[in-house]
Regions:
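Cytosolic regulatory regions built on CNB/CRP/Popeye-like sensor folds
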Residues: 1-320
């Protein structure tokens, strides 16, 4: 791989946090190829076996499942990043529109490299999580735009007293069942028991009264809430509706990726037992334990993919 090709990699957002040595590790598991025009790189809703790094050339992407139609990727760019997370299926069909100079990286090898070299892995998955969060935000906004002016299917709810933050005494003795509850939180599903203990150690367990505000949609958020027990209502002006999440669950993962703003406002409905994690403390822990960061951002991205599936299914379109 030439220095010029590595320099092109550094301009791609997915790799922008990586140092030169990490980029050479990445290119070491890939193969540079000249790909003829008209070559199918992957088909929507089918397994993605390779991450294609487009160094030069143009790729046509069709994404009927989300209503995004046809678009083009101009090198330097990547196609096939869905290979990074389960279920490893394509977000659209990619076909080269011109002859392309590409680096083909086997997806299995890339995922294994992220585990073997966790500092590389955490930078890769953090950027990917940011990308997929932006994609989810766009889909939510498009869904809201399509539904503008339509009546909601929800019955009116009685007025609720204004939510406010409450001063809750911190609990310094974690209950014995806390780790077993953490293991059931979807965004923590890839973490091992020792990693969960590290995470618990930097958090503060709280008992929250009904009506406690956890965060407002569209406003900066600097905490991640792990709801161990209880229910939280999420109101989203974009979707013109609300939903209830019940522990063990999480809210506030947006605090871990730019722009650090959640889509909805979260308020406790019942008394809740929760673990408060400050985003800056989580990031500091990831710096000390990058493998934890790989597993956390991997689970976070996987859960965002699931939300995208729900949105596309609700819109009555097949999932790509």
């Amino acid at each position: 791989m030439t220095e010029e090709a590595v320099a092109l990699l550094r301009t791609i957002p997915l790799f922008r946090q990586m140092g030169l040595a990490e980029l050479y590790l990445l290119t070491g598991i890939g193969m540079e190829e000249q790909v003829p025009a008209g070559t199918t790189l992957g088909v929507e809703n089918e397994p993605v076996t390779d991450l294609w790094v487009i160094l030069e050339g143009r790729v046509r992407i069709t994404s009927p499942a989300t209503g995004e139609g046809e678009s083009f990727l101009e090198g330097p760019a990547v196609w096939g990043a869905a290979a990074l997370v389960e279920p490893h299926t394509s977000f659209g069909t990619g076909v080269t529109a011109t002859e392309c100079r590409m680096l083909r990286i086997p997806a299995v090898d890339l995922r294994e490299l992220a585990v073997r070299n966790p500092r590389l892995g955490v930078r890769l998955y953090q950027e990917f999580a940011t990308h997929i969060f932006v994609r989810l935000q766009r889909l939510i906004e498009e869904s809201a735009s399509r539904n503008a002016g339509r009546p909601t299917s929800q019955a009116p709810r009685p007025a609720r007293p204004a939510a406010r933050r409450r001063d809750i005494p911190e609990l310094h003795s974690p209950p014995a069942d806390a780790l077993s509850l953490l293991q059931r939180v979807p965004v923590l599903e890839h973490l091992q028991p020792d990693q969960l203990r590290l995470l618990f150690a930097i958090g503060v367990e709280r008992h929250l009264a009904p009506g406690t505000l956890l965060g407002r949609g569209g406003e900066p958020l600097d905490v991640l809430w792990i709801i161990l027990e209880g229910e939280v209502e999420i109101d989203s002006p974009l979707t013109r509706g609300s939903s209830i999440i019940a522990g063990p669950e999480s809210w506030g993962t947006a605090s871990l990726v730019p722009p650090h703003t959640p889509n909805g406002t979260a308020v406790t409905v019942t008394e809740c037992r929760a673990l408060l994690l400050r985003a800056e403390d989580v990031r500091a822990l990831i710096e000390q334990s990058p493998r934890l960061g790989v597993d956390l951002y991997l689970a976070l991205s996987t859960n965002v993919f699931r939300r995208i599936r729900v949105l596309t299914d609700a819109a009555g379109r097949p999932l790509r």
